[in-house]
Amino acid sequence: MTTPLVEMDGDEMTRILWQMIKDELLLPYIDLKTEYYDLGLEHRHETDDQVTVDSANATLKYGVAVKCATITPNAARMTEYNLKEMWKSPNGTIRAILDGTVFRAPILVNGIVPYVKNWTKPITIARHAYGDVYKNTEIKVPGPGKAELVFTAADGTETRELIHNFDGAGIIQGIHNTNKSIESFARACFSYAVDTKQDLWFSTKDTISKKYDHTFKDIFQEIYDNEYKAKFEELGITYFYTLIDDAVARVIRSEGGFIWACKNYDGDVMSDMVATAYGDLSMMTSVLVSPSGVYEYEAAHGTVQRHYYKHLKGEETSTNSIATIYAWTGALRKRGELDQIPELCNFADKLEQACIKTIEDGKMTKSLSLISTCEHPVILNSLDFIKAIRETLNSLL
């Protein structure tokens, strides 16, 4: 390696797996260079979350990052970790700095049949990675009063809309997005569809959200008509817009094989649904692609809290590390492409092949065994599964 990856460490069970993957599958094989940032909740707390901002800025500098799953604290976590503040989602902070789009796709393996039987091809979720509820401002309303939405233009002109006249306690939320970010999102989706030669679907709720969601719809249509329509027609692929509820029904009836572009929250929810329906959330790749050509790879799942508590008690866990391994392989391959190191790309390919072959040979974690058609699966603990992948990798290299 010539340029380091930006390495963002994380929390709980995924943090344990992170080190296992490095020790067993990376360090023995490659000259791994990383610029390390500890995004574990304790360290974010110690640095007042500055470490998250620093890691995102380092990603802008170097171009490729790999991120471990992290805790986004809620009230229970504030008590558990004795936090002075309910720190924002690290992913939300990073995505706000990098902008871009999150593409999530299932890892398909022979022997793991989707719950939706007609899904024979992967569905890629393209999730807008900026704004909306992830960069919101919230107020708990203590009692009666008037809530208003106020925009003050640069020249001092005010636009004012009544949100609600409260006669008691309640809640208010302010969300935003920018045309620039929506345009970047649209172009990323159309470009990805052209690159992968797949149809693109986009869905919002513009019938209810006549300004906010309708702006998303209008920007997508304008960019498609002006910049991508001819290319789509040349490739024989289509762009299709529909309401989010109709899209969900169509997705379930489909055979897969397309990109489904979603707003930030919709993409968060639907990527979990799609991943689980294909088999397991730990079998889902995730990459954030920014308009400036910056890439951040991560697993699409959380920190596996339940397994971590078992691990702390000294109990054995059988945690699927595939998506976290694929975060590393995605980042290493992209680094190899950018730095023209074919050996690094080849290693990433071989490690992914080793993951698939290990599962198809019947060696897997407990969650995979529950959905596998393999008659006599060998259920391995977290470390032994990684060691089994290492054995397969050795046979492929």
Model-derived features: where do they sit?
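N-terminal small/polar loop signature for handling phosphorylated ligands or for N-terminal nucleophile
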Residues: L41-S55, K217-F258
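N-terminal glycine-rich phosphate/adenylate-binding segment common to multiple enzyme folds
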Residues: E42-E158, I171, Y265, V269
